[in-house]
Amino acid sequence: GSFLEFLPIIPYLVASTSPAFHVIVPSLPGYTFSSPPSVDKDFSRYDVARLINKLMVGLGFGNGYAAQGGDIGSDVARILGARYDTVKIVHLNFCGGKGPDIEFTEAEKPGVKRMGWFLNEDYAYVLEHRHRSSTISIVLASNPVALLAWVGEKFLSWSDVSPSLDTILESVTLWWVTETFPRSIYPYRKLDSSHGGPIHMDPNLHLNVPLGFSNFAKEIIPMPERWVASTGNLVLYRHHEHGGHFAALEVPEVLAKDIADFVKLAWR
């Protein structure tokens, strides 16, 4: 992912007057035009959160701000909400991990099936990024067609409606010309949290601040409401039949409305 995926949602957020937003869309360290972390030391999502909070305070939001994220950004947003008093509320559209054992409702079963498909058939890239980071980085940095194949297939299989070829090429070209794909997968090396499991299931990162969640049917890991509620102070949960992993790109107006409604409800 990159900031390109968030550009379509910005006009909807900026146009909101109740509430009104200052929208900050930072690139994570090492992504596209953002400076990389040092290669001689580990750099985790906890470090990313620390730098993002430092950025927000430096921009004048030391009295409080809202954090929002999907995919890796959702991990960073959770860490921010759990560890930094400057973060007043958190909205997510991804919450990877397995929650407590529950009996799924009929409405939840398609999402569980989708989750099973992803974990059984489409999860191999995570293991490659995590355990063979340098190997896959060398391969994808050596050939733009290889990078297109690796990234492009995710756009196709993780979206509700496939993005246009131009949209896919824009993202892949950005990775290629900035030569940043290898360092962008650094976070996978420290994929688990301190408790040995997914960030979102870490009891030490349970969110006491208000949590909002947007669930999209074609997300790679759709999350039942009760699972999300087990990870924090859930005050707003919305399920959408249309939309997938790249919600800000696919259905920006829908996600923007969820964010605005949540902020209006939870911000104090």
Model-derived features: positions:
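Transmembrane alpha-helices and adjacent helix-loop boundaries
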Residues: 168-169, 202
